[in-house]
């Protein structure tokens, strides 16, 4: 939504609620104020909202059902049931839903992009810790059909995009599972009976008990013992230790045997963990290093089981999107295939090859989730191609596609 300046950030009555934007700090993303010093956040949702109406009603963080909810942009409902970015666009109709704001403009054409993306994104960025659940398919389907039904009720045509697999984004692929360097002495201590050696011995004993007294087989026990055994070595490349609720609960046998293991390449460590791994839970106490002595909490890691939940929901949402596009004569934009290509081989856009590497890939912005201006230009072209194919327009044939060179991937910290 329209901001008052390029510093970014939001305030309510002078109190900051979101921070200014990220900038490139030479190696990776850093907060703007770390580069240029303190700035005043001038975009205040209680004081200076524009009145609209707006053609672009995309709301960061909005889930499918939020877009049909009355009052989602009413300041009096913030923060419990309103989104500050929605407050920016509701103007003189604060109780109108986002879809109602769109329909009120009596459009002849509309686009729906990434509907459902936030329904899985919140779960993913919180490491699947349960604080931000995936929207169930029935709720998503109701919201989707309500939106599309409202938009086509005036006779408007439109285009709708399916959802990419968000775990291919750099927010989930940048931080390695094994970033821990250790000297010989530290590695030896961690492997000793004073540290993880005791845990390793304990799980062997616990699984021996389970094999003897429950239906668990020795083969099953051996597989989980191997998964849970924690070892470190001198040098680079040691995996972080994580909590994993999918492991067998052994705490009733021995309270010290919590469900933890070392991460593997199949786990996805979230981008924000980069500044947390290696810090000390108790400053000055080297035996409280997060990710080594203290396992990473669920919010820092997406395990394979959690990734599967996201993939299942995304597949279900995409089936619904395809069905609603077909039923209503909408152009269907396959953004899922675009991200697959970008995250594997890279995707060509004019003279550039864009991929999902953080900062240097050119497609994904510094937050690791949203796209750069060039990335969004690429996606806009995919919409135009689908519109051409469905409605017989000639955006591509007439040369009226977005040009990659017109859209930068980073912006100067000094941009006013």
Describe the residue ranges of each PLM region:
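Conserved active-site regions of diverse hydrolases
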Residues: 1-416
